[in-house]
Amino acid sequence: MGRLLAIDYGRKRCGIAVTDPLRIVATALATVPASELITFIKDYMSREQVDEIVVGLPTTMSGEPSDSMRYITPALGRLRKELPAGFPVVMWDERFTSTLAHRAMLDAGVRKKGRQDKEAIDRMAAVIILNSYLDSPQSKK
């Protein structure tokens, strides 16, 4: 069984999280510039078995795709072209992940300076996306 990899995609940078090979625990992996995302993922997948990629889907409070989709959709198209044909890429609701990441850091006692680290928040948001997906029936397919 291979790992799951989650991406919290942003215009400037992307938070990335992965599971362990048994898909029990999700951990933060890295924050990479958006322009280097595909290279990073290809390199990681050359070293580790990844069976599925989960990408945060930014939605509005009403559940509609947000304006951010206008830059995420082309990036996903480029990513899919670089992956093997039919490789599973799942879009997953990411509402409130940045807020939840900030709250988790606060609860963990991270000082204010650490909570203002946008890269750390992006990584934590990717972990939250991945944990949400792992908790869903869809991830068990």
PLM regions and their residue ranges:
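Phosphate- and other anionic-substrate recognition elements at nucleic-acid/protein interfaces
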Residues: 2-7, 11-12, 17-141
